[in-house]
Amino acid sequence: MERTWYPNGQLAVEAPWVDDVQEGSVTFYYENGSVQATIPFYGGKIEGVQKYWYENGAPQGEETYRANMKNGPSIFHTPAGIMEMSLNYRDDKIDGSQIWYYPNGQKARVVELLI
């Protein structure tokens, strides 16, 4: 396990290693101690849902990874915890529509991405 601290003594990063390969969830912390992000590693590659939080603890976003590339849904929220935007990735490229939402949850804008 590798750990890094802020100058105030608060844990900044916690990263598990197995046989010199990142294995498990790497966790980043804000200086106040709240979780900033978690990144799942398997076999040294990002694999699974990477999650982010605002300093107030509200969810900021989620991105799905397969073999170190974005693959699947990505969702982002405002600091108040309201969904702001969603999109999908395939092989690290945006796949389909980018959808922006109003604070009441209704669609505000849809951007069709043609590749």
Which residue ranges define each predicted feature?
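Glycine/tyrosine- and acidic-biased, solvent-exposed loop/turn segments at the edges of beta-strands
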Residues: 1-115
